[in-house]
């Protein structure tokens, strides 16, 4: 029996369709070990399951098994010297993103930990993860110099523009008129073409146009909303890191909270953590009816993974005003300037704690990006909150 580098088997991933491989992933996470494979190429679904949970090694042989530690699932540590030979190496090895205990005082023994995703280098957001996974897979079959494109509310467009360029592709991003200014400007800085549709009320309303243009012009529509590499990037990255960090940090992890955009990162976090411990709570946050919070949307607008996976979750609603109240509270409690989608998740968790709906323990809030991108919203929030001495 032996352990083989999983990178030698990545070519089998594209042959796996659908979500049936996730049953293998769930079983490995629940049992804490994987069985040995006589011929890994003859079991592509099992190989993909190991890849998606973050294993770097495959157990090869007969009648044996290996633990998650032996598979490399726990092999996450930032190089002490923080020296990287390339930007992509920085992205890959500059992990995990920090998990920080907040000083916020929530009722009923609920302790808040902030997963700071603005430590991803390209877009300063969680969207780097799907952008790298999508483009790296695409690079195995699409000629360099090709045009890649997608609809975005802002962060994914920045990430796509940067990552596409690093892999030798041209990028185009489509944005609704209400997108944040950084989302319109930074892709141009990164060499991408930017198309803003002032008539589109939201990002998803741009998808028919992107699909039509892709058919007519022949570019690659990467489609973050329905590309399973999005969900799988968060399984390998965001969710796995929360699992490893909570174990290493000695957290009594009782739940995870986060906002819904494509549903990629929170579907992955819920699936991964509930596979390890089915009692883990997942609080998923959407804007209140008739309200708008940058980067997130309501479930009924159409989300793939949250509706396809066997996960348990509580859906919470938050207004933009409430989200920005939480941004102010975290800034004054912790000195950390989180974005409105992170504020929405903090506020939702606080509401659930106040209602007595959460067990005492540690709860991780995924903070997708930084509030430095949303200064007009911060200014409006301060007019309501006032100064604090």
From Swiss-Prot:
Keywords: Amino-acid biosynthesis, Cysteine biosynthesis, Lyase, Pyridoxal phosphate, Transferase
Record InterPro entries: Cys_Synth/Cystath_Beta-Synth, P-phosphate_BS, TrpB-like_PALP, TrpB-like_PALP_sf
GO function term, MF aspect, one: cysteine synthase activity
Protein function: Cysteine synthase that can also catalyze the synthesis of S-sulfo-L-cysteine from thiosulfate and O(3)-acetyl-L-serine, as well as the sulfhydrylation of L-serine by sulfide.
Organism: Aeropyrum pernix (strain ATCC 700893 / DSM 11879 / JCM 9820 / NBRC 100138 / K1)
Field pH dependence: Optimum pH is 6.7 for O-acetylserine sulfhydrylase A activity and 8.1-8.8 for cystathionine beta-synthase activity.
PANTHER family reported for this sequence: CYSTATHIONINE BETA-SYNTHASE (PTHR10314)
Family (UniProt): Belongs to the cysteine synthase/cystathionine beta-synthase family.
Pfam families found in the cross-reference section: PALP
Gene from which this protein is expressed: cysO
Name of this chain's protein: Protein CysO
One GO-annotated biological process of the protein: cysteine biosynthetic process from serine
Catalysis performed (reactions): O-acetyl-L-serine + hydrogen sulfide = L-cysteine + acetate; O-phospho-L-serine + hydrogen sulfide + H(+) = L-cysteine + phosphate; L-homocysteine + L-serine = L,L-cystathionine + H2O
Record lineage: Archaea, Thermoproteota, Thermoprotei, Desulfurococcales, Desulfurococcaceae
Catalytic activity, EC: 4.2.1.22, 2.5.1.47, 2.5.1.65
Annotated residues for binding of pyridoxal 5'-phosphate: 155, 261-265, 341
Disulphide bond pairs: none
Keyword Chloroplast recorded: no
